[in-house]
């Protein structure tokens, strides 16, 4: 009787263990640093304000580069890639309130129209390729099409 009870107990425990094993999270969640995430979120908010309210596209690019260099795993990096790509495109068209001064050495290397278009294609292509679920993907494709038509 004891042997049957022990065998039954092992079967029950084994069955329950297999069920919980099957339910475990197969893809581990990305461990995000809360301080870095908060800082990156702040930079994203400032970039949105610079983009939409001030039309300060150089400021958007500055915030993006700072954030991407420090924290490329940011949970909303797709949004930042979109902002950086569109800002690069608009700057290459000489739009916005911050104008590019190609007489300055610092801006000459970084903000030539060809370099800005190249960066816009890189940022937007990365968004489309790496983040297919992003809500910015369709707008990124439209801007990429505009960039390819201009070549």
Cite the ranges covered by each PLM segment.
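Repetitive helical segments and hydrophobic/amphipathic motifs
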Residues: 11-13
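Acidic, polar-rich low-complexity tracts and alpha-helical solenoid repeat scaffolds
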Residues: 2-8, 18-151
């Amino acid at each position: 009787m004891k042997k049957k009870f022990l065998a039954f107990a092992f079967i029950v425990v084994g069955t329950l263990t297999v069920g919980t094993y099957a339910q475990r999270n197969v893809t581990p969640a990305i461990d995000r640093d809360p301080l870095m995430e908060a800082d990156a979120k702040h930079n994203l908010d400032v970039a949105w304000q610079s983009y939409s309210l001030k039309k300060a596209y150089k400021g958007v690019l500055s915030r993006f580069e700072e954030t991407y260099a420090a924290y490329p795993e940011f949970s909303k990096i797709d949004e930042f890639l979109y902002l950086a790509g569109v800002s690069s495109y608009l700057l290459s068209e000489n739009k916005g309130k911050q104008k590019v001064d190609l007489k300055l050495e610092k801006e000459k290397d970084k903000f030539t129209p060809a370099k800005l278009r190249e960066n816009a294609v890189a940022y937007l292509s990365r968004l489309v390729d790496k983040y297919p679920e992003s809500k910015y993907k369709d707008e990124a494709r439209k801007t990429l099409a505009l960039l390819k038509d201009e070549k």
